[in-house]
């Protein structure tokens, strides 16, 4: 049973490392899974143990460099607006460069050298 408990903890820890956002529902689910994987005698302590597991998970997760879903969504929108502005600026720059680019200057026709004796 102890190995099942450790496996569950490792799997859940790996899951959280793979995500960058804290989802309260996910914390509840993990706390429930940990609680259910405990031996029956410990599980009988009930809701108190589950609350402590949830609190421990949340405190450990706050020590990680994670962002909330709201903050992630805000940064996603900022990035999209920045990309749009960049695309517009690149297009404008191309237009300005094309407009200001001098026409290709054709070299003047070569003038044959003047031979002083022919004059």
Swiss-Prot record:
Keywords: Coiled coil, Cytoplasm, Ubiquinone biosynthesis. Residues 96-119 are annotated as: Disordered. It is found in: Cytoplasm. Its main location: cytoplasm. Signal peptide: none annotated. GO terms for biological process: ubiquinone biosynthetic process. Residues 109-119 have a biased composition (Pro residues). Belongs to the UbiK family. NCBIfam families: UbiqAccUbiK. This is Ubiquinone biosynthesis accessory factor UbiK. It comes from Salmonella typhimurium (strain LT2 / SGSC1412 / ATCC 700720). The lineage of its organism: Bacteria, Pseudomonadati, Pseudomonadota, Gammaproteobacteria, Enterobacterales.
């Amino acid at each position: 049973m102890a190995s099942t408990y450790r496996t569950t903890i490792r799997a859940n820890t790996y899951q959280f490392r793979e995500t960058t956002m804290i989802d309260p529902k996910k914390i509840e689910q993990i706390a429930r899974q940990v609680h259910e994987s405990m031996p029956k005698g410990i599980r009988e302590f009930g809701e108190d143990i589950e609350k402590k597991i949830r609190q421990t998970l949340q405190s450990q997760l706050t020590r990680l460099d994670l962002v909330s879903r709201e903050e992630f969504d805000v940064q996603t929108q900022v990035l999209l607006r920045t990309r749009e502005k960049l695309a517009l600026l690149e297009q404008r720059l191309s237009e300005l460069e094309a407009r200001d680019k001098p026409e290709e200057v054709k070299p003047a026709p070569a003038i044959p050298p003047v031979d002083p004796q022919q004059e």
